[in-house]
């Protein structure tokens, strides 16, 4: 039997990294008896080691809690634990769409941060009831009144009735549960209407196939029902219905307003796309739910094994990861310098780092990552054999003939940065250096909120690291894409001994090409070992060399065996050596060690 709508509450928790979101979720589970003391572990909802270590949530998780409130009624509380990071913004928007309210968790010592804001605004767009929870009130540095003022000034939410809590110490947990019941509205829905359910998330389970997280809007989901995904157009037979408490629990059915999971013998996560609408195959709904969009990769980079024999292992590992992450795309590529590998697409830099870290950690692979690049749009003029067309460029090495390119467009983002006043100057300079356009600057209680428009290309490298180091870790940063704009961009190639090295080519702005090229050449000069002949290292745009360094040759003393005698004998030996070196320079291969590549790519943006 499904729970009456009036006794269901669906809510998510919005918080910046490290503000105590997962700990609060743990305490709510513990208080309502979802797990016994023995089963309780820190960060129950974060399954991956990386999630626990970095203190971030990557995949959305859901827990159904049963809570008997002070009014004597027993309520079904569905907690959606959502990712907090900008790379997973679309997953967050779908998770929020499945709820009617949200707990806004703010650290009593840190105050409101940029990422919190982005998710709060999304929550407000979904007409959510937002309950502020000020966490970590037992810290010595906690300043509750200041944080209340920030919530009111920055977000515009009344904070006088905010719940004061310390998830770690277990303070304010019951008050939080009572606030959820009293302030978050129950869902609306009709059990008799045709089935409409939103696909909130999906992941691969080796025993059950793809497990699909759904929020039922209208109708009822039952075992043995034939369902249809409206966007993908595929039909499936449900073989299991249930919920997480957080243990997997099988149910007979899931009704309107409820959140649960279904499995249907699906083998590929790509078929179960986040945001799709699930309906009955025999009596389908009239229209899918709004807001669905295809997730497009934003950042691309090449992944190569350091040992060529690991290529098959890398292929298998990437395919396994893809089972759980449909937003991650890959295709095979080969490079003269690095051998065989894959060109992979990611939602953003954190996504790239996580995939890379999971490959090295879970699959024990040693990887080289080429410089990340973004998606450029090229307008090509017509030729004798081809009409004019627009193409997307994911890999700088595939850049067509510059004479055919009429215009290159690059993606831009709008970034919101929060920073304490004393670090404002250096941060503004950093944004200016990255071709940023300042849009707004406001002050809120000792902190500045800066809005900048920046090219994504300039942010992709190490913008976030530089931002953190300049502000000693106090700045927080959030961004969203605002479309493509034309730019004066050129492809910079690196030539070692007059041979282009494809893995090091990159697309740069013409204004910064020279300094980037010079930096790269200087670095390679330090990294490549000396050979028996001299090696030129050049950075070039088209046919024009913009920077050059030369690695001097090692010298072998060929005249050492001559004692006295005629000077022409020595001359002859030196001439012969000169000839040999000339021939070596023409035919000799320069051995670029793997470490040189890794260091050059890692340092890709200091030039």
Swiss-Prot record:
| Gene Ontology CC entries for this record | plasma membrane
Q: Which residues bind GTP?
A: 18-23, 135-138
Alphabetically, which GO biological process terms does the record hold? Answer: positive regulation of translation
Cite the GO molecular-function annotations of the record. GTP binding; GTPase activity; guanosine tetraphosphate binding; ribosome binding; translation elongation factor activity
Do you know which CDD domains this protein is assigned to? EF4_II, EF4_III, LepA, lepA_C
- What coarse category fits the chief subcellular location reported for this protein? membrane
Which reaction(s) are listed as its catalytic activity? GTP + H2O = GDP + phosphate + H(+)
Q: Give the similarity note.
A: Belongs to the TRAFAC class translation factor GTPase superfamily. Classic translation factor GTPase family. LepA subfamily.
Its name, as the record gives it, is: Elongation factor 4
Organism (species): Sphingopyxis alaskensis (strain DSM 13593 / LMG 18877 / RB2256) (Sphingomonas alaskensis)
Task: Name the lineage.
Answer: Bacteria, Pseudomonadati, Pseudomonadota, Alphaproteobacteria, Sphingomonadales
């Amino acid at each position: 039997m499904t729970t009456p709508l009036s006794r269901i509450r669906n809510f998510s928790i919005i918080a910046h990294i490290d503000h105590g979101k997962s700990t609060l979720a743990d305490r709510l589970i513990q208080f309502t008896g979802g797990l016994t003391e023995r089963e309780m572990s820190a960060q129950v909802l974060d399954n991956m080691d990386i999630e626990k270590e970095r203190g971030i949530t990557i995949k959305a998780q859901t827990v159904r809690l049963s809570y008997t409130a002070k009014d004597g009624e027993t309520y079904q509380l569905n907690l959606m634990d959502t990712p907090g990071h900008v790379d997973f913004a679309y997953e967050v928007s779908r998770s929020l769409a499945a709820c009617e309210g949200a707990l806004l968790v703010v650290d009593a010592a840190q105050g409101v941060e940029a990422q919190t804001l982005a998710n709060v605004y999304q929550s407000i767009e979904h007409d959510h009831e937002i309950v502020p929870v000020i966490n970590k009130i037992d810290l010595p540095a906690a300043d509750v009144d200041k944080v209340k003022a920030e919530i009111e000034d920055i977000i515009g939410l009344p904070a006088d009735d905010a719940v004061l809590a310390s998830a770690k110490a277990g303070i304010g947990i019951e008050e939080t549960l009572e606030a959820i019941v009293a302030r978050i509205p129950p869902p609306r829905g009709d059990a008799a209407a045709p089935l409409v359910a939103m696909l909130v998330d999906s992941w691969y389970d080796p025993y059950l196939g793809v497990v699909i997280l759904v929020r039922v809007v209208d109708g009822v989901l039952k075992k043995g029902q034939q369902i249809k995904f409206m966007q993908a157009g595929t039909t499936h037979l449900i073989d299991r219905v249930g919920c997480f408490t957080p243990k997997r629990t099988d149910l007979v059915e899931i009704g309107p307003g409820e959140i649960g999971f279904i499995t249907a013998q699906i083998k590929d996560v790509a078929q179960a796309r986040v945001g799709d609408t699930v309906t009955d195959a025999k009596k389908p709904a009239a229209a899918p739910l709004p807001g669905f969009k295809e997730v497009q990769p934003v950042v691309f980079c090449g992944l190569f094994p350091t040992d060529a024999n690991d290529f098959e292992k890398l292929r298998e590992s990437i395919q396994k990861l893809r089972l759980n992450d449909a937003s991650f795309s890959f295709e095979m590529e080969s490079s003269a310098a690095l051998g065989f590998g894959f060109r992979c697409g990611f939602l953003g830099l954190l996504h790239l780092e996580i995939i890379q870290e999971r490959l090295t950690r879970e699959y024990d692979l040693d990887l080289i990552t080429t410089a990340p690049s973004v998606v450029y749009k090229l307008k090509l003029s017509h030729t004798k054999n081809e009409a004019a067309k627009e193409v997307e460029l994911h890999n700088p090495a595939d850049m067509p003939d510059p004479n055919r390119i009429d215009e290159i467009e690059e993606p831009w983002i709008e970034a919101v940065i929060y920073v304490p006043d004393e670090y404002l100057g250096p941060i503004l300079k950093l944004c200016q250096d990255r071709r940023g356009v300042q849009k707004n600057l406001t002050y809120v209680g000792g902190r500045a909120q800066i809005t900048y428009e920046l090219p994504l290309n300039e942010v992709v490298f190490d913008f976030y690291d530089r931002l953190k180091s300049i502000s000693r870790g106090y700045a927080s940063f959030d961004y969203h894409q605002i479309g493509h704009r034309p730019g004066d961009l050129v492809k910079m190639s690196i030539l070692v001994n007059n041979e282009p090295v494809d893995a090091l080519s990159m697309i740069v702005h013409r204004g910064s090409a020279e300094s980037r090229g010079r930096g790269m050449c200087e670095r390679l000069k330090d990294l490549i070992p000396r050979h028996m002949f001299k090696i030129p290292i050049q950075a070039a745009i088209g046919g024009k060399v913009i920077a050059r360094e030369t690695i001097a040759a090692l010298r072998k003393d060929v005249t050492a065996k001559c004692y006295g005698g005629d000077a022409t004998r020595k001359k002859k030996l030196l001439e012969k050596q000169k000839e040999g070196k000339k021939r070596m320079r023409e035919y000799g291969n320069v051995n670029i060690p793997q470490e040189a590549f890794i260091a050059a790519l890692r340092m890709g943006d200091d030039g």
